[in-house]
Amino acid sequence: MSERTKRSVGVLGAPFSKGQARGGVEEGPIYIRRAGLIEKLEELEYEVRDYGDLHFPELPCDEPFQNVKNPRTVGQAAEKVANAVSEVKRSGRVCLTLGGDHSLAVGTITGHAKVHPDLCVVWVDAHADINTPITSPSGNLHGQPVSFLIRELQTKVPAIPGFSWVQPSLSAKDIVYIGLRDVDPGEHYILKTLGIKSYSMSDVDRLTINKVMEETIEFLVGKKKRPIHLSFDIDGLDPSVAPATGTPVPGGLTYREGMYITEQLYNTGLLSAVDMMEVNPSRGETERESKLTVNTSLNMILSCFGKAREGFHASSLRVPDLI
């Protein structure tokens, strides 16, 4: 990567909620910014360009397709995100997308792949989000984005309204899941049939997060260096540290494990795009829970950009000599 790519970040807000049923997740971007995101990235010596928030008009009469809800609204929003992410990547910046619900990963990854078609993905989540429109129990598109992206699944994914623009950009060997603990039967079948590398929380417990990250990095970029896209659903973390999200699942990654994942991805020097998804301040039962979730998401983001738990100092800092 160029020096500018390593030290320059483009922040893109995606305040969108129609991939699932719970309102409030569209407020994620503004809350994360208010927590000091831009200033803290600048303290890490990044040149930051804030591209602002995308606008997502709600389409009237967006009838379900079979049981898939809001297909045209979600498809249009994801396409807008894809175009915006491509613009950020063409500028040479690392792209940070603030969601919004996880259906938008169809857009973030497709947009990234337009510029870096050899990318790979680390997907941190309690859920696999790889249901097809046919296997999805709920019909919510935030549980389906990966199915649109995987080439080996395209004979299983029907043409649904709003998604004709999507071209699959990943093979099954290009993605690794970390943190799974609520996987639907159809998703489990897909993961096992395609041999997609995934680490459930049982695997994390058994191997430790250090081994999980060693294996993940070796699998994705050990033989060939290529851009890494981190798509981070905040519900990958345990509800004790990130309660304000739409579908929390007990028994998740600890704060320390989340930090270790992001630190190790930063240390590769290959992290090219980051999604922070499903932060929903309205789902906190108290103001403290909402603030805790926002601050946790902020710290995960900053760790992606080099904030180390051991401390940090500006390159210009000097301890003055006594006169």
UniProtKB/Swiss-Prot annotation:
Belongs to the arginase family. Keywords: Arginine metabolism, Hydrolase, Manganese, Metal-binding, Urea cycle. Binds 2 manganese ions per subunit. Its cofactor is Mn(2+). It comes from the Eukaryota. GO terms for molecular function: arginase activity; manganese ion binding. This is Arginase, hepatic. Pfam families: Arginase. Mn(2+) 1 binds at residues 102, 125, 129, 233. InterPro entries: Arginase, Ureohydrolase, Ureohydrolase_dom_sf, Ureohydrolase_Mn_BS. Pathway: Nitrogen metabolism; urea cycle; L-ornithine and urea from L-arginine: step 1/1. GO terms for biological process: arginine catabolic process to ornithine; urea cycle. Mn(2+) 2 binds at residues 125, 127, 233, 235. The keyword Manganese applies. GO terms for cellular component: cytosol; nucleus. It is an enzyme of class 3 (hydrolase). Substrate binds at residues 127-131, 138-140, 184, 247, 278. NCBIfam families: rocF_arginase.
